[in-house]
Amino acid sequence: MDNRIPYDDYPVVFLPAYENPPAWIPPHERVYHPDYNNELTQFLPRIVTLKKPPGAQLGFNIRGGKASQLGIFISKVIPDSDAHRAGLQEGDQVLAVNDVDFQDIEHSKAVEILKTAREISMRVRFFPYNYHRQKERTVH
């Protein structure tokens, strides 16, 4: 199954203005300098796999859905849970679960899929900007 989404189907998101690195940090030192970090790999999509025994909790909460037009986001991760150990964090956008697209899904349908699955393969990305916009809309 091809999980790529046509470019025209992506929502338009206006990001804050990019801030240039300080001029006093030489370009060859910017990657590892403690006052400037241009490492963006934390924002790339990643796969998180969880196994849930019958009757067990997933270890995280979600918010959002189709009504918010911003997607489904991880809103809470229980410390020391399997979800926490797998690397899920507040602000992760859930892109897909078990090959089901979560970018335009009703909240109730997303909850149903997550609660009924025993093995979960989630494609997520850390997207704090839209997560904070999501919280401002007070939908789920």
Curated annotation (Swiss-Prot):
Q: What does this protein do?
A: Mediates docking of ADAM10 to zonula adherens by interacting with PLEKHA7 which is required for PLEKHA7 to interact with the ADAM10-binding protein TSPAN33.
Q: Which InterPro entries match?
A: MAM_complex_regulator (IPR051109), PDZ (IPR001478), PDZ_sf (IPR036034)
Q: Give the PDZ domain ranges.
A: 47-129
- Which GO molecular function entries does the Swiss-Prot or TrEMBL record give? enzyme activator activity; transporter activator activity
User: Where is the protein situated, by its record's location annotation?
Assistant: Cytoplasm; Cell junction, Adherens junction; Cell membrane
Name the keywords, alphabetized: Cell junction, Cell membrane, Cytoplasm, Membrane
For this entry, the protein name equals PDZ domain-containing protein 11
One family from Pfam that matches here is: PDZ
Record's subunit section: Interacts with ATP2B1, ATP2B2, ATP2B3, ATP2B4 and ATP7A. Interacts with PLEKHA7 (via WW domains) at zonula adherens; this interaction is essential for the interaction between PLEKHA7 and the ADAM10-binding protein TSPAN33. Interacts with SLC5A6.
> Which GO BP terms, alphabetically?
biotin metabolic process; pore complex assembly
Does this UniProt record's set of keywords contain GTP-binding?
no
* This protein's GO CC annotations: adherens junction; basolateral plasma membrane; cytosol; plasma membrane; pore complex
